[in-house]
Amino acid sequence: LICHRVHGLQTCEPDQKFCFRKTTMFFPNHPVLLMGCTSSCPTEKYSVCCSTDKCNK
């Protein structure tokens, strides 16, 4: 599983998805992007799950 990310490519295990989420838990006016491979991607706001080379918003 290879997902396009902001800078380059991210490779995940076959049974995993690449997920990134915007959060502001550290700086209220400065969004932080959390990203990584996971087996289940949460469907909360600002989440994007990737499969193969396409992302579903």
From Swiss-Prot:
Site (Key residue for inhibition of muscle alpha-1-beta-1-delta-epsilon (CHRNA1-CHRNB1-CHRND-CHRNE) and important residue for inhibition of neuronal alpha-3-beta-2/CHRNA3-CHRNB2 nAChR): F27
Pfam family, one: Toxin_cobra-type
Sorted UniProt keywords: Acetylcholine receptor inhibiting toxin, Disulfide bond, Ion channel impairing toxin, Neurotoxin, Postsynaptic neurotoxin, Secreted, Toxin
Effect on the protein of changing M25A: Complete loss of inhibition of rat muscle alpha-1-beta-1-delta-epsilon (CHRNA1-CHRNB1-CHRND-CHRNE) and small decrease in inhibition of neuronal alpha-3-beta-2/CHRNA3-CHRNB2 nAChR
GO MF entries: acetylcholine receptor inhibitor activity; ion channel regulator activity; toxin activity
Residue pairs linked by disulfide bridges in the UniProt entry: C3-C19, C12-C37, C41-C49, C50-C55
Important residue for inhibition of muscle alpha-1-beta-1-delta-epsilon (CHRNA1-CHRNB1-CHRND-CHRNE) nAChR, annotated site positions: T24, F26
Name of the protein described by the UniProt record: Neurotoxin Oh9-1
Organism: Ophiophagus hannah (King cobra)
Organismal lineage: Eukaryota, Metazoa, Chordata, Craniata, Vertebrata
